[in-house]
């Protein structure tokens, strides 16, 4: 099981700092990392990630510059590109595949892409080696979840975590800390999904403190840390310090 899936916003604090952060993440032993593509209308993001995206945009971190800046980087965990559909459509499918090819990006998590809405776009990316991460909300029925998992198939145990996992949304609403997350429904949800598929599961939205992360791990799932980490970095902490207490074996 992957013990932690952190989230970073590309371009915050700067595009120039991104290679160093990715290198530090790999040195910490993180096998995968979510990398947010800054977007001006991030409907699923809470105030912390919205502010980070705006800072990145203000410093010139366009989607194109982010992807171009990732080219050739090898000292990095596997990246899951966390993004919205419109910036990708503006780049175009063919160009997007060419841009992704020399980067450490292994998969995409497109938060506002309804399942089945852009089949040709999604299929082209998957065939090029960039599958879409299945996103399973609390309102997703089990029948629907089974369909999504079948249409976004597990490539198998030989594939990296970044290309295998399904993302379980812990609660409705936007990302962020301080809102509280009742993990009892999450435990039931994880158990239900385990009966449908053997693929790895990651749980995100509203997780931040070491106790909640440990609870998610006890379910055999990977906790996602986003807003708490992004805020710590914005407050001037280094990556190792920001993740202190949240890694397995800390504390």
Task: State what each model feature region is.
Residues 187-199, 208-251:
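Alpha/beta catalytic cores of nucleotide-metabolism and tRNA/nucleoside-modifying enzymes
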Residues 46-80, 123-138, 184-201, 241-251:
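Alpha-helix-loop-beta-strand connector modules within alpha/beta enzyme cores
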Residues 4-8, 33-35, 79-83, 108-110, ...:
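Hydrophobic faces of well-ordered beta-strands that scaffold small-molecule active sites
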Residues 15-27, 140-152, 196-197, 203, ...:
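Catalytic cores of alpha/beta
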Residues 57-61, 83, 104-117, 130-149, ...:
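Catalytic beta/alpha-barrel core
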Residues 32-42, 105-109, 114-117, 167-177, ...:
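Glycine-rich phosphate-binding active-site loops on the catalytic face of alpha/beta enzymes
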Residues 49-51, 55-58, 145-195:
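Glycine/Thr-rich beta-alpha phosphate-binding loop at enzyme active sites
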């Amino acid at each position: 099981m992957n013990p932690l899936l952190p989230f970073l916003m590309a371009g915050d604090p700067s595009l120039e700092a991104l290679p160093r952060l990715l290198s530090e993440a790999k040195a910490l032993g993180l096998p995968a990392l979510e990398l947010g593509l800054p977007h001006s209308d991030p409907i699923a993001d809470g105030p912390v990630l919205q502010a980070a995206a705006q800072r990145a945009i203000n410093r010139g971190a366009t989607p194109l510059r982010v992807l171009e800046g990732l080219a050739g980087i090898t000292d990095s965990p596997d990246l899951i590109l966390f993004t919205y559909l419109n910036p990708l459509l503006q780049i175009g499918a063919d160009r997007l595949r060419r841009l992704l090819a020399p980067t450490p990006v292994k998969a995409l998590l497109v938060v506002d892409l309804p399942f089945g809405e852009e089949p040709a776009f999604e299929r082209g990316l998957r065939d090029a080696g960039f599958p879409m991460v299945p996103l399973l909300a609390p309102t997703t029925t089990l029948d629907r979840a089974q369909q999504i998992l079948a249409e976004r198939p597990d490539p198998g145990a030989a594939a990296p975590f970044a290309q295998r996992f399904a993302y379980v949304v812990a609660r409705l609403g936007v990302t962020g800390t301080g809102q509280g997350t009742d993990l009892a429904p999450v435990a039931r949800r994880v158990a239900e999904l385990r009966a449908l598929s053997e693929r790895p599961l990651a749980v995100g939205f509203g997780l931040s403190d070491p106790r909640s992360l440990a609870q998610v791990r006890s379910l055999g799932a990977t906790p996602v840390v986003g807003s708490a980490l992004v805020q710590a970095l914005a407050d001037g902490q280094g990556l190792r310090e920001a993740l202190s207490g949240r890694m397995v074996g800390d504390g």
